[in-house]
């Protein structure tokens, strides 16, 4: 099975700092090198805090819910009721991000044989802008979706990568195709 395990690395810092950390390099070394000749899925995200405390590990991406691992770029404006002033001032550690709430909500549908239909219905019921990538745990696929038209991708026979920002540097991803 392609996804027999999901390994997560996340940190609360700027991407340029994160990728230069020794812990990140060790993470890649320990987890990627043994997979380069096998199927491999990597989902990454850097988070601009719009709501939910950045100091709460569970709010930082990739997000893990019971049945879903995913990333979200954008903002959902109708998923939570909370004191927006506390969020804007980063005062509340316990406020969940809109992304965490989103993935927890769709996690309920993960084992439904009509998951895609339920997912699309859910997307149509929420307010906000999103580009989302997710994996239902144990499934051999990644689902990507956007309502703001910003999904950029590269595809070859055995390689697919995507981004929600046009300015992504494809060179590191393309280097993986030459293994």
What are these regions (language model features)?
Residues 1-179:
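Conserved short alpha-helical segments that host acidic/polar catalytic motifs at enzyme active sites
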């Amino acid at each position: 099975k392609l996804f027999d395990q999901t390994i997560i690395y996340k940190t609360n810092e700027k991407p340029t700092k994160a990728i230069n950390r020794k812990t990140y390099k060790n993470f890649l070394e320990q987890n990627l090198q043994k997979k380069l000749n096998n199927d491999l899925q990597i989902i990454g995200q850097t988070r601009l805090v719009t709501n939910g405390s950045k100091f709460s590990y569970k709010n930082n991406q990739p997000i893990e819910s019971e049945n879903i691992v995913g990333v979200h770029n954008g903002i959902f404006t109708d998923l939570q009721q909370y004191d927006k002033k506390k969020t804007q001032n980063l005062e509340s550690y316990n406020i969940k991000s809109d992304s965490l709430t989103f993935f927890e909500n769709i996690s309920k549908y993960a084992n439904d044989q009509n998951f895609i239909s339920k997912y699309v219905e859910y997307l149509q019921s929420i307010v906000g802008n999103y580009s989302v990538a997710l994996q239902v745990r144990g499934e051999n696929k990644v689902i990507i979706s956007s309502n703001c038209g910003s999904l950029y991708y590269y595809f070859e026979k055995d390689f697919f990568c995507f981004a929600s920002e046009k300015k992504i540097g494809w060179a590191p991803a393309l280097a993986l195709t030459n293994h």
